[in-house]
Amino acid sequence: MLTRRSLRDSVLGVLMLAGAIGAGVGLAVALLHEAVVWTQSFVFSVAHGQDLGEAALADPWRTLLAPAIGGLLLGVMVKLVRRWRSNDIVDPVEANALYGGKMSLIDSLRLTLATLLSNGSGASVGMEAAYTQAGAGIASTLGQKLHLRRADLRTLVGCGAAAAISAAYGAPLAGAFYAFELVMGGYTIATLAPIGAASVAAVAVAHWLSDPSPALFFGRPAAVEGWDYVACGVLGFLAGWLSILAMQAVTVAERGFRALPIPVWARPALGGLALGALALAVPQVLGAGPGADPSQLARGLEAMAILLVAKIVASALSLGSGFRGGLFSASLLLGGLFGGLAYGVVELLVPGLGLDRMLLVLAGMGAVAAGIIGAPVTMVLLVLEATQDFWAASGVLIGVVVSTTVVRQAFGYSFATWRFHLRGVPIRGAYDVGWVSELTAMRLMRGDVKTILTTQTLDTLRRLHPLGAAKTVFAVEPDGSYAGIIDMGAVHDPSLGDEDAKTPVGELAKHADDFLRPGDDVRSVLQRFCSAEVEALPVVTSPTDRRIVGYVTEAYALRRYSQELERQRGEELGERSLYGRD
């Protein structure tokens, strides 16, 4: 039987649990995919698997109104659920960064249902957000039921997300590195085996339940030569700016909808109506998008340019108005279109250069997706698994590296971290920084506080606290509020005469404005010590009610901070040392 101790002490136990999670998530992804297809078939009256663009041409009224009705249902549902659960939904990245992998299964199902409704009604959003939220939520809930430690719970969240992407695209390598890059915050030896096991198990189950053909499939490019690599680099540079444009478009749309004098629950309906009107002109904008579908890339330059712009606008309208979902699949379509468009422009300007069209399509797909999603290795591996062509992957790697460099230097965020920034969440990735906020002054402080009233004399202070009895004594006002720190070395200074014995100790108190609050994290505590240049600081109830509840020494705060850093490093390496995996 799997218990907490067996999981802590057995690599095989963790692998078995990860494999079981992967299989369960693979089943969930297959069911969600069928639910989306069924919903779209019902809403748009299309045959199973038929493209939504074809339905738009057959029934314009349904195309115009279906996204609006879906948006209205979504808005009402969110409003009603908010009365029951008003908290924000924590996604896998935020959970691993701030909460040690703790996620709510109910909240994850909320997001999954909202994304299913959004995608099913034609909103230009992807289902990958629902897949990863459901997978990570299932894994986190199971880990919490087993009372796993923080590092193991974070790993299980990564397993759930990796399994979701692996099952969705039939790409276990891409799914695993999606977890490493976005959900875990990095690759470590300790997490390689469980995340790899979950990815493979998810793909196996998904292939067993559904069509085993890959979600993305391309013919192999021709031989890759020197000019092709140069073209991939230039394309990556331009793709980086396109990625920034797509992310900023969502922000502009969101601000625009917020400025409208309509209730929040009505915004998705209005956004859906605008999306439906756009779909009457460009039907391919409905739904997540077909990825970099070769059928869309076989169109003329003008048609590809129109679809590229329309897809950016459609995604911005959908996400900005309140539909739930992500830009994973949309970014693949945008990148593929951009690569095909770039090839056509080069052929017009420099005919006979001999560039490979499909290579530029793949490089554009990887570069734009990496810029928006923030997972460069994932996109390279996704292309590699889709094409099974190492030369193509090398060209894509160049475009991806240049694109992510442009986005990082010019913008500084991926789409996920940009959304965190707009919400005021202080994280740039899934690196575990939650322990910093959990190690507070309340946890660091000691309760044996030595205080004295400011009205008492120096002689009284000497009698109450003889030389060597205490390093620091805190002065307090008659009402108990903090008034400053008294240096006991100065109090027992031999140079002080008898006339100084009657001096009120309040005159010796310093640093009256230097104190800690119970909720201050260890980083804030150390910064306060650095600025105050004292050995100990009091912890007060609040800046207004300055009653002392404890004190923290700089030496102890530094020691605890170092221990936690060592513990984090040990967990990354899978060590079982004093401060590693316990």
Name the predicted role of every residue range.
Residues 1-438, 442, 447-464, 470-473, ...:
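Alpha-helical transmembrane segments and immediately membrane-proximal extracytoplasmic
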Residues 452-469, 476-477, 493-498, 502, ...:
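The conserved cystathionine-beta-synthase
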Residues 177, 381, 483-491, 549-557:
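Short hydrophobic beta-strand motif reused across regulatory alpha/beta modules
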Residues 426, 437-450, 456, 487-490, ...:
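Bateman (tandem CBS) regulatory domains
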Residues 385-387, 543, 555:
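A short, acidic, flexible beta-alpha connecting loop/helix-capping segment that sits on the rim
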Residues 1, 423, 570-582:
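Intrinsically disordered or compositionally simple regulatory linkers and C-terminal tails
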